[in-house]
């Protein structure tokens, strides 16, 4: 137990009760003192006995203490009650009972002394003060007891027998209560002391356990120190890495900005300078492909009998391996291939005539086939003969086939134009040119390769006008029925099959006389097929046009919705910053405030980290810059700006440290403050000169575009007459004396619409270029200055200083007041501005 909180002393409570009892006794004695004294002898004896007992109290304290300690240990309450009962029976021993009470109290005090000794043994230093206090209390108690005894002796002489009996009874009753309370308090006191002793013993027993706990805590502290050490190492490594990245970025900026600034307009490449050497682009793979195609074109198709190879093909086949060897050597030596015009294969291809070779092959095939052509009956239809031509010649000659049965079989089957069969080419079919669709949807010439019985071959062309000849009336009834069947069958054809495959006309290279009606019917069939192909292409073309019209209508609806949204954006929302941009600007201001604190405490490592965060925020600003520029380049916004009379005066809101005499003086002061070296000063001056040159050109273009756009709105969109009343509020670029023509409102011409759209797009590009130039120049300064110098510059010139929401709210209110009156002029706008500035509390 702590010395500051001493143990409770039950003696004080007991003595307070005794003093109250004695005071009551004295009052009772004083009231009864007037009664006649009786039995003086007994009183004298009592007084004498009391005096004797009081004199012997001091001698018998030790013995009584010993006896009382034993009695207190063995149920003090019972002994005291027994003693009190005996004293009640003997009136002569009244004061002895009082002495016993006092001795018990003293014994309790002695018990306290003994217990205090025990406590002193357990609690070495803390209980010394307690013992001293208890001893002092015992001395005080003895003095109080002696004084009380004297008072009792003096007062007891005047007692009568009756008074003695009453007093004894009262004293016994009070003493019983006091003794019981005293014993209870003493027992509680002793129990508390024993508990303290047990706690001390437990604490002594747990010393070894506490030592183990201390060792574990020391180990945990060592582990925490090691973890902190590793964390510090990681932080140092990360800071070192950030510093390396920052230095690398500075080196990149130095390499980038040592070159002169190039505007996008100077990067335009003319068509004369942008000529590509296609000979250099020609690779070995392309030459191999050309050789392969030339070989395939030169090789004839597989025919039943071999055809003689022309000398040109022989020379080309000899040149091809030589060319491959040359290409392999050039690839090994890393030499560019020669131009395609100088290659031997190109010369052979250029001198090679495909048409002559094809005609020669056709003549040879016709001559060979004419020797083995089967003799068909005269009553066979021409279309059926074409089906018979598909059979191999050897199969017809060697096998005695009944031609009439074969014809009946073909009639039962589907015709050529059915869905189940696909048009095929016989070995003697020659390539034909199919008609193509022109924008005027007129049929084109359909050249077909025909063969005559003679050796000479010629390409004959048949136009659609030839189908109107009177010879077409001489067709037979068989051909009429065939064309009707073909028309009915084509109505059932699937469109997908017609789109994927084309109907090929029937070959006319048969051994049939020209003047025969069968040959004329074949021509009629070919014409029908060509017209059918033409109609199908016409349908496809119409379908394509319908799809385009549908796409255009959808796009028109989309543009209409965008136009409506532009009207809304051109309203009050145009002068309101988005939440993302506002958050970005607030973050930039917070970083600059942290930089100021780091500059005050000279913390360079934290400055490097903050500069890295600052450049990340500036990079994000590029993303939102285009959205804000779109709001300004909106035609509805420009129309209202023309009403207000706004003209772009500055390149960007904020402090311009790159242009003008004020910027020169400020830069000189900055150089002295941050101790700029001579090399850094030269780089800064060159950077400023480049910025000024480009910025002046952009500013000139912006002013020119602004005046042209305003002139368009004043002349074409709304009518306004500038007279003498508003000479002070003249708009730049338009003289006050000029009266603009008042035109009737109506739709603008297409050329005028395209012109204003082009100007607005140019204005958007110029504004974007101007903003990016300003931000790029600030970013390039980091490559010239040290981190501390750059931090000083950024804190003094804050490019995020325009993030004042109150100013934006004021401008938004003015703008909303302007757009409420769509035909209000500059005078009305000026009056509204005056009202707003006179009564700022209304905002």
Swiss-Prot record:
Residues 316-333 have a biased composition (Low complexity). Residues 27-92, 298-347, 430-478 are annotated as: Disordered. The keyword Metal-binding does not apply. Residues 519-520 are annotated as: Basic motif. SMART domains: BRLZ. It is found in: Nucleus. One of its GO terms (biological process) is regulation of gene expression. Residues 298-315 have a biased composition (Polar residues). PROSITE patterns: BZIP (PS50217). Pfam families: bZIP_1. Its main location: nucleus. Residues 517-580 form the bZIP domain. GO terms for cellular component: nucleus. Keywords: DNA-binding, Nucleus, Transcription, Transcription regulation. InterPro entries: bZIP, bZIP_sf. Signal peptide: none annotated. Residues 522-529 are annotated as: Leucine-zipper. GO terms for molecular function: DNA-binding transcription factor activity; sequence-specific DNA binding. Belongs to the bZIP family. PANTHER family: CREB/ATF BZIP TRANSCRIPTION FACTOR, GLYCOSYLTRANSFERASE-RELATED. Probable transcriptional regulator. This is Probable basic-leucine zipper transcription factor S.
